[in-house]
């Protein structure tokens, strides 16, 4: 069941820039377009405080 829907702006950035943005925010994830691959990706905080990266295959 979807309880809430949000719209996000997707910005072009490197994976490192996305990691820095995540570090400086309270968000659990950042959705961005990877400048190298030109793919929409998601970097997120893992339960062990490391970061994970989701790169969907199209």
Please tell me what each predicted stretch does:
Residues 1-58:
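N-terminal, polar/charged subdomain of small-to-medium soluble alpha/beta proteins
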């Amino acid at each position: 069941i979807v309880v809430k829907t949000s719209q996000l702006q997707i910005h072009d950035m490197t994976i490192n820039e996305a990691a820095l943005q995540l570090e400086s925010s309270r968000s659990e994830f950042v959705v961005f377009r990877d400048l190298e691959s030109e793919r929409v990706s998601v970097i997120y905080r893992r339960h062990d405080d490391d970061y994970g990266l989701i790169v969907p295959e199209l």
